[in-house]
Amino acid sequence: INLTDKCLSCHKDGKIPHKNYKGEEELITGYQNSVHYKALKDGNFDAPTCYQCHGAHEMESTDNPDSKISKKNIANTCGQSGCHTSQLTDYKGSIHEIGVGKDNKDAPTCNNCHGNHGIVTKNVENKLEKSRDIVTLCSNCHSSVELVERNDLPTQVSETFSESFH
């Protein structure tokens, strides 16, 4: 936890050592309110820290294919040892992973649906507001005329969701 707090102490104000131009304060407070940070504070030292996902000072842009948080690598980062291994297994070979592998910018990976830093527990009372209902989430893409046409997506995701593996 000391390492995570150390990262947060420098990055919180967005001035030292550099500003995150996507909204530093939101990223920090999102992580501090996340299930990951709570688990860390509660003594689960396997919970993800800044360092585990981003590395220390060797951080690379999400545009760099070698980055741990690039679109092609984020699922492996989330599924690294002790973390979301069963979810990674489900994702591997899925239509979404195949799309990401083909550099389809529309294809989602973990953080497109679950977010980056403000990840909430599945037991949060107001989960719908925090992480959006899964059917609605899927429908955001699968009901978009532009995305459906561009990617030849099935349009009846909401109707068939409960009949699928979910």
Language-model regions: role of each:
Residues 1-166:
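Short sequence/structural segments immediately N-terminal
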